[in-house]
Amino acid sequence: MGLRFSTASGYLFSVDNHLSESALEVRNAIKAELKDFLAAQRGYLTSIADELIPVCDALDEYLLDGGKRLRPLFGYAGFLSTGKIPGKNDVRALSSLELLQACALIHDDLMDGSDTRRGKPSIHRQFETLHSKNSLAGAPAQFGQAAAVLLGDLALVWSDQMLHQSGISTESLTAALSIHDEMRVELMAGQYLDVREAGEKVHDVKRSLRIARFKSGKYTIERPLHLGAVIAEPNPNRHAPLLHALSAYGLPLGEAFQLRDDLLGIFGDPATTGKPAGDDLREGKRTVLIAMALEKTSSSGRSELMKHLGASDLTSAQVENLRHIITESGAVAEVEKLINQLADESNSAAHNDVIHEKARPFLLALAESATKRSY
C-alpha cells in the first residue's frame, strides 16, 4: 500500500512503487499551480495590449498541454528525501521549474531550427504563421525567430517570479535561489558547449559526455533534487550530506537520461516523440551516440556520416542508411550498455541511508521512467 500524504492545503499525494499513480497526482498539482499562475499573467499582459493574447495562448498551450514534468517531480523527490512532506507553497515553488524548461526548449528549438515540439509547430514556427496570417510587413521567419526569443525570455522571467512569489519561507527561498542560479548558469553553459560542439572538426566522446552532464544531467535531475531538498531543509549544516547523496544518485541518472534522449532523437517513433524521424541527424546534433559512431565505424561509414550529418533535406532513405551505419558501428549497443551502467549506479546511490526511506520508491520509479522512456 502506498504512503498517503495530506496537507492543510488539501493536497493528497501517494508515494509507492508505481510511478504512474503517484506521479500523476503530483503532475496534476503542478499543472494546477501553473494554470493559476498563467491566468494571473494573462490578465496582466492583456491589460497592456490585445496583441499579446497570442503570446498568452502559445505559452498556455506549451505549458499546460504537454510535458513530462520531470524537473518538478525530481524536486518533489528531493523534498521527500528530507523526510518532510511538500505543501501547496512548496509545490508552487517547484512548479517554477516548468517555466525554466519552457525557456530552454523554446530557445533550443530556435537554435536547432526544429519545426515541431511534442507533435505541434515549435514556437518560432507558430509566430511565423501568425505573421503571414495577419499580413504583417517584413519577413515571417525573422518575426517568428524574434518572437521565440522573447517568449523564451518571458518564460525565464516568469520562472523567477513564480519562485519568488511561491510563499515559501524566507530561509527556504534564500537557499533555493542559490541552487536556482547555479542551475540556470549550468544550463546556459551546457547549451553553449552544445552549440560550439557542432563546429568542432574532430568529435570527442568525452566532450559529448561533458555536454550531456551540464545540459541535461545537472539541470534535469541533480539541481531539481537539490532545490527540493533545500526548500524543505534550508539549513546548510543539515542539508549538506543529503545534497551530496542526491548528487550521487542524480548525476549518473541525468547522463543516462540524456543518452536515452540521444537514441530517441535518431531511432524514436515520431508518433511517440512528437519529432520527425531522425531529427537529430538533420539538425547535426553532436551527441555521445554520434561521437561513438564516428569513432567505431569504418572509414566509408565515417565519410557518409560526416557528409550527411546536419543536412536539413535528408530523405527517409538517407536517414535509414545513417541509422544502419550507426547501429552497425556498435555505438547503439555501447550507449545502451552505458545507460544501464549509469542507471545501476544511480539506483545503488538511492539506497544511501542519508536519503529518507519514504523517498526511495519514488526515486527508483523516477529512475526507471527516465532511462526506459520512449519519448
Residue ranges and their predicted role:
Residues 1-97, 102, 106-107, 111-141, ...:
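Conserved N-terminal diphosphate/IPP-binding helix and adjacent helical/loop segment
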Residues 44-49, 62-71, 146-158, 164-267:
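All-alpha helical catalytic cores of prenyl diphosphate-utilizing isoprenoid enzymes
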Residues 49, 260-273, 303-309, 320, ...:
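A glycine-biased, small/acidic residue-tolerant capping/turn segment at secondary-structure junctions
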Residues 74, 159, 190, 290, ...:
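Residue-level signal for inorganic ion chemistry
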Residues 89, 168-178, 185, 238-242, ...:
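Acidic/histidine metal-binding catalytic segments
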Residues 90-118, 178-188, 218, 226-229, ...:
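Active-site alpha-helical segments that house and flank conserved acidic catalytic motifs
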Residues 118-152, 201-218, 244, 270-296, ...:
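Divalent-cation-assisted or electrostatically stabilized phosphate/pyrophosphate-binding catalytic cores
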Residues 321-375:
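C-terminal charged capping/lid subdomain of soluble metabolic enzymes
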